[in-house]
Amino acid sequence: MLDPSIDSLMNKLDSKYTLVTVSARRAREMQIKKDQQIEHTISHKYVGKALEEIDAGLLSFEREDSE
């Protein structure tokens, strides 16, 4: 079983596409800046660490209104 689960992650964001975009951007940021918001993570990969941050409520996403 994956941790965090897709169900718990979907409660944090509005769609799977948003989840992929936010986690990929955060993973890339962690690779470049070598920083993470959670000290002890289960995952050793950047995308997994980003998903754990989303699950912990440390990352969020707000849509801009397009006019």
From Swiss-Prot:
Keywords per UniProt: DNA-directed RNA polymerase, Nucleotidyltransferase, Transcription, Transferase
Reaction(s) this enzyme catalyzes, per UniProt: RNA(n) + a ribonucleoside 5'-triphosphate = RNA(n+1) + diphosphate
Presence of keyword Transcription:
yes
Record-linked SUPFAM superfamilies: RPB6/omega subunit-like
Claim: Transcription is one of the keywords in the record: yes
**One of the record's GO cellular component terms:** DNA-directed RNA polymerase complex
Know the name of this protein? Answer: DNA-directed RNA polymerase subunit omega
Recorded hits in InterPro entries, A to Z, give:
DNA-dir_RNA_pol_omega, Pol_omega/Rpo6/RPB6, RPB6/omega-like_sf
Quote the function comment for this protein. Promotes RNA polymerase assembly. Latches the N- and C-terminal regions of the beta' subunit thereby facilitating its interaction with the beta and alpha subunits.
**Entry's family note:** Belongs to the RNA polymerase subunit omega family.
* Any Gene Ontology biological process: DNA-templated transcription
Q: How does it assemble?
A: The RNAP catalytic core consists of 2 alpha, 1 beta, 1 beta' and 1 omega subunit. When a sigma factor is associated with the core the holoenzyme is formed, which can initiate transcription.
Organism listed in the record: Bacillus velezensis (strain DSM 23117 / BGSC 10A6 / LMG 26770 / FZB42) (Bacillus amyloliquefaciens subsp. plantarum)
**Gene Ontology molecular function terms on file:** DNA binding; DNA-directed RNA polymerase activity
Enzyme Commission identifier(s): 2.7.7.6
